[in-house]
Amino acid sequence: MPEENLKPSEPHAKRLDPDNIKDMVSQLPEPVGYRLLVLPFTPKEKTKGGILFSQEQLDKARIATTCGYVLKMGDLAYQDKEKFNKPWCKIGDWVMFARYAGARLPIEGGEVRILNDDEVLGTIGDPESVLHYI
């Protein structure tokens, strides 16, 4: 099969972000137990100076991202009193996690990850304040 048949028809489709995924959240998988459903941060396609990143650079950055937006939480997330004295995050928070943490689930326009509650390393107010390029 020719390689061009394997590529998406719109390589620069609108990037997923917390604002435009709201209508899709109800259709996404429900995390069970102590898991979280997270939308990984998608870097912008252009720098502040106007330089465009190649599709390969964007794909690498998407895979290597370490920030995500919490979409859903399982009913047991942060309930283990031996590990947590309070939740580390809540729905609507931007969180940081290890580069290859969680299970990746491709969805229309990007991917979501299912993380264990203890894979969250911290919260961050603005994911653009962290460099996401490798």
Where are these regions (language model features)?
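Compact, glycine-rich, soluble single-domain proteins
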Residues: 2-134
